[in-house]
């Protein structure tokens, strides 16, 4: 039998070109070093939860943000409410107006409950309806908007102070009292006897009237006629015109407002009106459409 060829030898594996460095052997007689791993650091959330100061800061921050949101909502709602009431007033009196709701309780609470404690309104002083240069200051309290039937709610109390300077009275009389309009060139108020003196040109005619409260309305009673006024303006013709004038001024005042007092000052006239437990009617009046 022929001799068998030796099996092919396995291919030699070349040695690694970059051998991995090995740690130096420990010196003789020395125990090998044991590597001790550091414990894992606790998570940040766990450390925060275990820190009382951090918890307090988080709580304070949350409360501050909540308060800021509530205060912001309160200011915005109050501004909207003030604007709506002012716009409605401007529509009624034909003049600019500003309004503000009471500080307490918060406006949002008043709006949610439908009960408003007090509202203040001030007009610019250009006119109140037909009364030129008149200023109105209104104080409204205890408004309940829980309406029933034909009522939108009730107003517990409404007090109005109307301030009318002499120049405005003269202008209004000239526009609204034809029998006097062309004759009145000057007007003077006398606080001592509570009268208003209407003078014609060059003092040739004088009419003295006294404002009074009669049956919840205003009245101008003729006190004296002098000069040409006594000839051209007989009392029996003048008094009905003054009654009509006073009625026109107040007949369109809303919510059953009635005159309480009228005071003649050195600069004009101040009248005070009021109403209590007034029902707010459901109307199609465009002035109140957006309230």
Language-model-detected regions and their locations in the chain:
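Short extracytoplasmic/periplasmic juxtamembrane "stem" segments immediately C-terminal to an N-terminal membrane anchor
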Residues: 83-102
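N-terminal beta-strand/beta-hairpin edge segment
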Residues: 4, 96-170, 174-183, 191-196
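Solvent-exposed coil/turn segments that connect beta secondary-structure elements
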Residues: 104, 124-126, 141-143, 201-203, ...
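Hydrophobic alpha-helical membrane segments, chiefly transmembrane helices and signal peptide h-regions
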Residues: 54-75, 99, 271
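Terminal targeting segments of Actinobacterial cell-envelope proteins
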Residues: 1-59, 63
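Aromatic-capped interface at the extracytoplasmic side
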Residues: 70-87
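Extracytoplasmic/luminal low-complexity segments enriched in Pro/Gly and acidic/polar residues
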Residues: 236-291
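Soluble extracytoplasmic domains of inner/organellar membrane proteins
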Residues: 170-239
